[in-house]
Amino acid sequence: MSGSSNQFTPGKLVPGAINFAEGEIVMNEGREAKVISIKNTGDRPIQVGSHFHLFETNSALVFFDEKGNEDKERKVAYGRRFDIPSGTAIRFEPGDKKEVSVIDLVGTREVWGVNGLVNGKLKK
């Protein structure tokens, strides 16, 4: 091909290139995180995504507060999600009990759909 160049020129933009800024990305900076435990009492694996309202997860998941007490009303999960990178998930195999970090949902603090337990603004 005459007139075309496949050579890279430093300082020029390259289509499809990803340029990263210096430093680290701090996830959920300034947000208060709590560590709770969750156990899968079911007979199938359960995977929960990063922004899923934990209060409305599969009923086979049992929640424990920061002191290790079972929370049958799921108060520790109400209005919260996992403190993990967007687009990731945590998987609970049958019988698994894991300590997880959770943070409050932010923005308009509305939850619609899911299991239909809130369908509107969160109360706290």
Curated annotation (Swiss-Prot):
CDD domains named in the record? Urease_beta (cd00407)
Per the UniProt record, which EC number(s) apply here? 3.5.1.5
Question: Hydrolase: present as a keyword of the record?
Answer: yes
Q: Tell me one GO molecular function of this protein.
A: urease activity
Reaction equations catalysed: urea + 2 H2O + H(+) = hydrogencarbonate + 2 NH4(+)
Q: Which Gene3D superfamilies match?
A: Urease, beta subunit (2.10.150.10)
HAMAP family in the record, alphabetically?
Answer: Urease_beta
Assembly notes: Heterotrimer of UreA (gamma), UreB (beta) and UreC (alpha) subunits. Three heterotrimers associate to form the active enzyme.
Full protein name: Urease subunit beta
